[in-house]
């Protein structure tokens, strides 16, 4: 992996943040592009947030990107531009928690500190046949202690990386390859035939399905985009204006747009898009809402902006809106002026 070409704590920090809730094959191109653009903590500390978000576009969990900028600023301002090598100092950096601190300390500095991610939780729960809910904090603490007890002196970096790889490639969630596992003879769950039942986890909550209206508002030349609040789902990213829609409380799109100062001439259905997050599913119905620039009352500010269709590519949009962005870029230039429609 490119982040393991050396023991640079900055590269390890970036990679570990990117790998949170994200597959390795997805992260690879993003990591290469990110490091090419921001090769040092100083470069990241001086970055424009929107540029970083654009580079992160499609990777998801966008708070990670904002925390990286905040973290880089803290490293530059409080640690003279050097990634600290103590657990307490690392955990004072935004976005760095128990696992990431352990990964940086063990991999970059070869310190005997456990780095317990989902893969390691699974491996250790099976190795010792831990028949407890591994999502509980006290159980995670127990597993951290078990990992600490088996880290070989002077080999924390290679051991922790090997443990992660073991979980990713051999001790997998549904089909563990016990016959080629180096711990085949001593794995308690294999001996007791529990490897397919462990680790124990609290069942996930069902995904909530939400219907949304997405308004692609076009004045004959430009399209209106909205910047989401910095905190919360898809924070700080751009979108087309939208809202939740319930069958039992219909409100016309025309009246809804009037609330933000948009008077529409025509409302035309365009595309249907479904996007699933970890805990949420959006069923989105898109509508082209045609207005006239001369009667638009909405003012540009930090939340709203009028842009040309071809400029949409320059803004960081979440994957959920990609199909709407592509539709707008490909279709809107073909429309003349709303009065001609």
Range-by-range predicted roles:
Residues 1-179, 183-196, 263:
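Catalytic cores of DNA base-excision repair glycosylases
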